[in-house]
């Protein structure tokens, strides 16, 4: 039985025994036939080295890591079938590693865009012409944005902050993050001012009087939901002339980290501020460091153009 016949037998099994959809079968067929045509002697008799060479070839042809991984998955399934049917005495895919997916760079905002966003929040918070509920919402949003950009907190950490953070008015506070680990977070003067303004407005809402949270709400958790904050943030961005699709609380956290690194912060310090347990998580920002080094050389090297 040649490779083409064995591929057909595999597809028949996938259809009859596993109920694979037509689209799934078509995808398997394309991937297996492409592999078979790319390997001398066909796929069914291939050794591990042959399959590895094929994977190297499609990588050089520009296939994305996700496409490479999908093709390898189809090949693995094919050889499991051959082994189970007694058509192979080994599985050559057992020693092959899946292609590593490139970690996407985090979305972020420029310093100018972030400045526009925060300035807009400040203007709205100071608008005496707003009605009571709108003014309350504007003061809350201004405090949220200032604190998020000043600290780089995770959105879940931000919305669940205790009211004591604002009452103490300290330059630092402790936050409990992932894995129940605590870390010290600095607060800028602007963030403290925005929090105090919100705290004063919050004190005038009887429903909030007994809440232990800085941003209380009538929710199951007792504090503002991440979804409501994300919605309000997108609305603020649109009013600041920034595409709302470009922004989220997570993007503002990334802006905090990127802007620190652009202005000379150490990667380890940023790791601690973000609450990353492993430096490898923070290393998604190394592109910022690389850009900074290029600028440094271009600006200061005596022979730079």
UniProtKB/Swiss-Prot annotation:
Magnesium recorded as keyword: no
Segments forming domain Core-binding (CB): 1-83
Chief localisation class: cytoplasm
Family: Belongs to the 'phage' integrase family. XerD subfamily.
GO cellular component terms listed in the entry, alphabetical order: cytoplasm
Pfam families cross-referenced by the UniProt entry: Phage_int_SAM_1, Phage_integrase
Disulfide bonds: none
Xref: InterPro entries: CB (IPR044068), DNA_brk_join_enz (IPR011010), Integrase-like_cat_sf (IPR013762), Integrase_catalytic (IPR002104), Integrase_recombinase_N (IPR010998), Integrase_SAM-like_N (IPR004107), Recomb_XerD (IPR011932), Tyrosine_recombinase_XerC/XerD (IPR023009)
GO biological process terms held by the UniProt record: cell division; chromosome segregation; DNA transposition
One Gene Ontology molecular-function label: DNA binding
Catalytic residues of the enzyme: 154, 178, 250, 253, 276, 285 (o-(3'-phospho-dna)-tyrosine intermediate)
PANTHER family: PHAGE INTEGRASE-RELATED, TYROSINE RECOMBINASE XERD
Subunit structure: Forms a cyclic heterotetrameric complex composed of two molecules of XerC and two molecules of XerD.
SUPFAM superfamilies associated with the record: DNA breaking-rejoining enzymes
Alphabetical UniProt keywords: Cell cycle, Cell division, Chromosome partition, Cytoplasm, DNA integration, DNA recombination, DNA-binding
Domain Tyr recombinase: 104-298
UniProt subcellular location: Cytoplasm
General function of this protein: Site-specific tyrosine recombinase, which acts by catalyzing the cutting and rejoining of the recombining DNA molecules. The XerC-XerD complex is essential to convert dimers of the bacterial chromosome into monomers to permit their segregation at cell division. It also contributes to the segregational stability of plasmids.
Protein name, as recorded: Tyrosine recombinase XerD
């Amino acid at each position: 039985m040649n490779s083409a016949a064995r591929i057909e037998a595999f597809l028949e099994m996938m259809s009859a025994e596993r109920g694979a959809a037509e689209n799934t079968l078509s995808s398997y067929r394309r991937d297996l036939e492409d592999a078979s045509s790319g390997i001398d002697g066909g796929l069914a008799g291939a050794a591990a080295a042959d399959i590895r060479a094929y994977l190297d070839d499609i990588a050089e042809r520009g296939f994305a890591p996700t496409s490479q991984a999908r093709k390898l998955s189809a090949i693995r399934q094919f050889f499991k079938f051959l082994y189970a049917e007694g058509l192979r005495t080994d599985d050559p895919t057992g020693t092959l590693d899946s292609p590593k997916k490139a970690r996407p760079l985090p979305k972020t905002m420029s310093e100018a865009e972030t400045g526009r966003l925060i300035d807009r929040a400040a203007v709205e918070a100071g608008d005496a012409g707003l009605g009571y509920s709108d003014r309350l919402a504007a003061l809350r949003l201004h405090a949220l944005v200032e604190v998020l950009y000043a600290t780089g907190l995770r959105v879940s950490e931000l919305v669940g902050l205790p009211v004591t953070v604002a009452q103490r008015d300290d330059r630092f506070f402790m936050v409990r993050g992932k894995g129940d680990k605590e870390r010290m977070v600095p607060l800028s003067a602007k963030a403290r001012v925005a929090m105090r303004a919100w705290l004063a407005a919050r004190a005038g809402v009887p429903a909030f009087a007994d809440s232990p949270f800085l941003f209380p709400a009538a929710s199951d958790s007792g504090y503002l939901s991440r979804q409501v904050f994300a919605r309000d943030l997108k609305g603020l961005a649109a009013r600041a002339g920034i595409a709302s699709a470009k922004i989220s609380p997570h993007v503002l956290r990334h802006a905090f980290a990127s802007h620190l690194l652009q202005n000379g912060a150490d990667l380890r310090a940023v790791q601690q501020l973000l609450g990353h347990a492993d430096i490898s998580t923070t290393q998604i920002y190394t592109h910022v460091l690389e850009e900074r080094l290029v600028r440094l050389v271009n600006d200061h090297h005596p022979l730079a153009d």
